[in-house]
Amino acid sequence: DKGSYKVSGGLHGVGVSCVNALSTLMHVEVSREGKLYMQEYSCGTPLAPVAEVGTSTNNGTLVTFMPDSSIFIESVYKWDILANRLRELSFLNAGITLTLTDKRSVNEDGTFKSEVFHSEEGLKEFVEYIDESREPLIDNIIHITTEKNGIPVEIAMTYNTSYNENIHSYVNNINTIEGGTHLSGFRRGLTRTLKKYAEDSKMLEKLKIEISGDDFREGLTAV
């Protein structure tokens, strides 16, 4: 199905069904069309049917869950892991605002530890964030958006003075750390394009050496 990857990452991620099965209690509230609905589960089993419990002026879903201590030896939530993921999501979804609040940690003024993540320029700001401690080789981030077979594709990239390749690839917000055809296709396309430009400009004649894809990716940072 050519349309599968419009909504799927092609990976077996941990979704709400998995969280539900591994929680002694999961409480879900849904605000929709002026009404508030609620349902509770225990170890994946509904405790009662979905119930309309009131009215609401909002739209959205609130999920509260308690991990099953008989399965998890330790269930301590680490701020840095959650903050890094929400920061990543804010870059991948330009314009949205995500807030992380830790009610275990109280500030001197009585408020809870909290951080807001928001990015107006998305992937461009993501690349700037990744490369903030590196010396740039070009002034501006290269940003490309296109669509193929109804599936949107977005790339932001730049070069720095290091010798390392630093590429982060995602499918529908999922970090595809093991790569995939989207990543190998990008690498091939980049090599083909830059090599053709170098040949047309007769740059390679002066060097008298064979240029590989690795050479074109030295100092590259891309998302």
Predicted feature residues:
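GHKL/Histidine-kinase-like ATPase module
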Residues: 80, 88-89, 95, 99-223
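GHKL-type ATPase core
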Residues: 1-120
